[in-house]
Amino acid sequence: MSVYLLNIALIFIWAFFLLKYKPSKNKKKAFCAIACVQWVILSGLRGMNVGADTIGYRRSFYRIGLTSWHRIFADVSDYIGGAEIKDPGYALFVKIFQVFSTNYQVYLVFIALLFMIPMAIWIYRNSSMPCLSFIIFSTLFYSFYAVTGIR
């Protein structure tokens, strides 16, 4: 829990130095980039016992690694045909990722990048108060995001 509080404190500190005095587009961009990097580190390098579903997704990640491509494509095809198969697109996504890395921690960092970069860009473009946007995300929405967001 203390690491989340530290993250929020750092967001306030960066906002104070970058957004409070003589704000500019470049400072806003730097703030959003720094906050994004913080969240990628926090989310991507979390322990396996953080979050209710991290261990389950880890097991699923390695189980998918043992599943043949033929089975993955058959499941996707069956799902498109109307069969009730749980998350065939997620299995395909993980299998494609495993072409590049079979390390689950690398996968978590990749997922964090995939989620946080677009979010930071959106905040940069659409928020007049990026500090508040990141704080709201930090306090309200992060608990809903994990690998579940990709699934």
Outline where the language-model segments fall:
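Membrane-interface micro-motifs in multi-pass membrane enzymes
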Residues: M1-L6, L108-V109, S143-R151
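Transmembrane-helix signature of polytopic, membrane-embedded enzymes
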Residues: N26-K29, A120-L140
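Extracytoplasmic loop-helix module adjacent to an early transmembrane segment
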Residues: K29-C36, S43-R71
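Short hydrophobic/aromatic helix or loop-helix immediately within or flanking a transmembrane segment
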Residues: I55, R59-L66, H70-T102
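Structural signal for the C-terminal ends of transmembrane alpha-helices
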Residues: I13-K25, G44-L45, I117-S127
